[in-house]
Every structure is written in structure tokens, then in C-alpha cells.
Amino acid sequence: MTEKYKIGIIGLGYVGFPLACLFAKKYKVIGYDIKESRINEINQGIDSTNEVTPEALKAALSNGMKCTSRLDDLKSCNVYIVAIPTPVDDFHNPELVPLKKASIAVGNVISKGDYVIYE
């Protein structure tokens, strides 16, 4: 496992969760989501989105992937990937409130020299 980077994935939905499982093959990963129920199901080995096979989820958890709804748990990361949905309204304008909230959250835990990637 590569020790140089510890990756925090913010948003464990259709994009962030498969990404977290994939990165967990090589890196230390902490997945973060505001939905406690989502965190509980993932930590129990269940993926209600069906984006990841049960075997891939089990492998990610076995490799040390941690999932949490506690923002402070991300402080040990040095790479942050924000994978938050940006739905559009009836006029095709993106709803940016969730993205702004996620950005503020990341801003509360990053350190100088860390990387932030928006997916």
C-alpha cells in the first residue's frame, strides 16, 4: 500500500463510493458522507447503489478503507476528492449549495500542501 497519500473521498454516492473502493486497492482511504445511514450500510458491507460488487466492497474494507460521517476523521488525509452531486433545476442551472457546503467542510480540515480535487 502506498503510504505517501491518504485520500479522503467526500460524498459516497454513485461516483464517490466506487472511486473510494478503487483507490483503497493501493492507498489509505477515508470515505465521508453526511448520511449516517449510508455510512452504516457501507461499514456493514452493503452497497444500496449497486455500484460496487460485494466482493469489491469487502476487499476495500479489508484493505483498511474507513467510512465516516465525522468530518474530523478526514484531518489525517492529504488528498481530498469531492464527489458531490450537482443536480440541475428546470432551467438547467446547477444546484451548487451541496458543493459549496462540501467545500467549506474540506476547508475546515485541509492543511497547507494538501490537494483538493473536484470530480
Annotated model-derived regions:
Residues 1-119:
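Structural/interface elements that position substrates and couple domains in central-metabolism enzymes
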